């Protein structure tokens, strides 16, 4: 089936690969698997190999509730830092789109949401789920390259294209092939 408006499906409560594959086979749309339980976390590797999977996300509130994590505690923060890193590594290892951050439930606390969005952007996440219209601009800004990042990337790529050198310095920063590739990616995404 071809869909003109729908470009993908966020599938909640994923616990096994076959759920992702069933939705993909039925709808022929890329799937974002939302991991929301200990069972789902334990199956991350298998889920990441699902046919039709585009990206992983997670449900912070459901996981916190199931595991009886104390909301706002350092322990809860540590748990989700670990989970984010695990999801990011599994996504990279299986060539998925970078993960999508869970919702930020306190939609009136724009400062805290901005900090969270910036943090997960720095971790290499590709976006963030939003539950309120006021969150959309905050998320969009967090996952957009800054003017200074774009300017630096442009200088790097211009120097690389002009000289062919794969090791050089720009603005006192050592540049080698991984930095060049990162700059190319940044400019392509902008």
Language-model regions: role of each:
Residues 1-190:
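Expand to "…catalyze enediolate/carbanion chemistry for C-C bond making/breaking, isomerization
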